[in-house]
Structures are given as C-alpha cells and as structure tokens.
Design a protein with these regions (language model features):
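Conserved non-catalytic scaffold segment of RNase H-like nuclease domains
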Residues: 2-128, 132
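Conserved protein kinase catalytic core
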Residues: 16-18, 191, 249
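Conserved DEDDh/DEDDy metal-dependent 3′-5′ exonuclease domain
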Residues: 78-198
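Active-site catalytic microenvironments for nucleophilic, acid-base chemistry
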Residues: 130-137, 192, 227-228, 250-257
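A structural motif
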Residues: 175-180, 195-207, 211-228
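Acidic two-metal-ion nuclease catalytic site recognized across multiple nuclease folds
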Residues: 205-216, 227, 241-333
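Aromatic-glycine-rich donor-binding/catalytic loop that engages nucleotide-sugar donors
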Residues: 228-234
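Histidine-centered active-site/metal-ligand motif
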Residues: 237-238
C-alpha cells in the first residue's frame, strides 16, 4: 500500500515597497497592509509520512523580493538579512527567481496527497497567490499601472473601517496553476486535537502565554511546540524551513490521533475558550489569584493603562475595565 505523503509549507513575507509610506511608519497600519498584501521572500517545506518521518526538505530565498531592498526592508524580520547571507555563504540556501522556485515547488506538490501549513489561510490563500500575481505583473508591461492600483488599495486598507466581504472561497483546496491540492490546516487541527486541554492552558498561564488582549490563550506553532516537547523556553527561528520542521512535528502528533480533516478552520483559537472563563471555574486559591493576575496584566497593558498619558476611552476599553474589576475581586484586591 502506498504511503500517504504530506507537505508542510512555511513562508516568511515582506510587503509592497510603499507600505511604510502609506502607513506613515505606524507599525499597526503597516501590519494591516502586510497581512493583506504579503510577498514571499523565504519559502520552505517538508515532505513527510504520517508516522512523522520527514524524507525531503527544501528552502529558497526569492530573488525578486529578498534581493530588492525596498521590498525586503518592509519585512517584520528584516533584521535577519545577515543570517540569510551567512546561510548562502555556507551553501545552506539558494536565492533563485520565483519561477525557478515554483518549478521545484510544483514538482514536489505532485508527490503529495495533502498539503498544508500551520496557518494555511495565510500561506496558501494569501502569501503564495499574491506573490504569484506580483511576479506576473513585475515582468509585464502593465506593472506600473498595477502598482498604482495597489497603492490605492493599500490606502483604503489603512483608512477604511474593516468590512467583511463575501467572496468565493474553497477552504478545502489550494488552487495553484490550474491544479487543486487537498488542503489541511495544522493550526485548526492542533487546537482541536492537541491544545484544548487543562495541561496546555495551565502552561499558558504559568508562562503568561495569552494573546495581547488577554482574551484568548496563545495557540501559535511556538507555544504548541513548547507544550508537546516540554521545552518551555523554545523560540521559533522565523525562517521558513526551521518553522516548517517544527510544524511537521506538530502534524505528526495530530496524525497519531487519526485521519485528518481537510479545510481551513476559522478562528481555531476560540475552541480553547476564554482564560477568564477558565479562572471563573477554579476554586479560590493562590493559583486562581495568580492566573487572574496574568489576565489582568495583559488587559492592563493592552488598554495602554501603563502609558504616561491616559488613553482615549472606547467601548472596548469600558468592557475590558469591567472585566478587570472582576479579576481584581478574584485576586483578592
């Protein structure tokens, strides 16, 4: 019987070269552009069997993005450039045109039964398709007209209030160059099968691993790997192949629990519930006080209450302040 083959992909991305200008160097506004218009500069993937055996791995830098300072300098991890140059010096990675890299990528896709990433929505529905479009336009005579249109779109991204737009979307497949590939999402599967447990949640409390708002438990590849490996100081490399390798390990733990479901799971972190609800069910104890304090500190910082100037009140802040009063009661303050 043929062994099933799984491809796990990770990308590191920059964005369009005028992002900083449009965002006026505001990191949050730039982040909105970077999420909506990602350009891959580092791509890595593994091929593995369901027992976790990785039998092939690849990693490439992309010439049209990594080697163009105005693009690469928009990357969140632009400071890693010397690391990549050292890797190239040691022949650990090649920098090739997108077309060449995609030839290798498509050839490996043909070997696979399933393809996925930790955040398949980002990698397969945004980063790879938008980079494919960008490269097509870059080598076309209409690039400047397209760039001008993208500039206007990015202006709208940072200025217009968020509106959910309904559009055709296939969560079960990665469509690329006229072929559909069965798609899984490691993040959603991990939240469903590995992380929605008391041990994981208590690790998050003990390590203050909640989202910045304090409303949810962190469910990143990094925190999942810490839990599964019991390596609580582990930090992701944030280079494509290294991250794909830890995501492959997480997938192996998921596969050990049975057949995977296809598709992208929207907001999978919500499956773990709210940290406040977890603390609410605890009996009064020092541990309960400690966990309540972890949530309180997250909310305090997120609302900007530690800043010299008090923030402008919002409805969200008012609701958060109400939660903080409840937390203070649980903390015995």
């Amino acid at each position: 019987m043929k062994k099933l083959v799984y491809m796990v992909v990770d990308t590191e991305t920059a964005t369009l070269p005028f992002a900083n200008e449009i965002a006026n160097n505001d990191p949050e506004l730039k982040k909105k552009i970077a999420i909506a218009r990602p350009l891959v500069y580092d791509i890595g993937w593994t091929l593995m069997y369901r027992d976790g055996t990785v039998f092939e791995k690849k990693q490439f830098l992309i010439t049209e993005t990594f080697s163009v300072p105005s693009v690469f300098n928009t990357a969140y991890y632009a400071s890693k450039r010397p690391l990549y140059l050292a890797m190239m010096e040691r022949s650990e990675i090649e920098c090739l045109p997108w077309a060449k890299v995609m030839e290798v990528f498509v050839a490996d896709l043909a070997k696979c039964d399933f393809v996925g990433a930790f955040n398949s929505m980002f990698d397969f529905k945004k980063a790879i398709p938008f980079t494919e479009l960008y490269i097509q336009k870059l080598y076309s005579p209409t690039y400047y007209e397209w760039e001008e249109m993208q500039y206007r779109i990015c202006e709208n991204i940072v200025s217009a209030p968020y509106q959910k737009k309904e559009k055709d979307f296939d969560p079960d497949h990665f469509s690329f160059r006229d072929t559909d590939y069965d798609l899984f999402d490691v993040w959603g599967l991990a939240c469903d099968r590995l992380l929605n447990k008391k041990g994981y949640k208590e690790m998050c409390f003990e390590g203050s691993m909640l989202t910045n708002s304090g409303d949810y438990f962190k469910t990143s590849a990094e925190t999942a790997y810490r839990y599964l490996r019991e390596q609580y100081d582990f930090e992701e490399a944030h280079t494509a192949l290294a991250d794909a390798e830890i995501e492959s390990f997480i997938l192996s733990k998921i596969l050990a629990k049975g057949k995977i479901d296809l598709g992208i799971d929207y907001f999978p972190f919500q499956k773990l519930g709210h940290p406040m609800d977890y603390v609410r069910t605890m009996k009064p104890s020092k541990k309960r006080e400690r966990y309540a304090d972890v949530i309180y500190q997250k909310m305090y910082d997120y609302c900007g209450l530690s800043e010299d100037e008090p923030p402008i009140p919002t409805k969200y802040m008012e609701r958060t302040m109400e939660k903080m009063e409840i937390l203070k009661d649980w903390m015995g303050i």
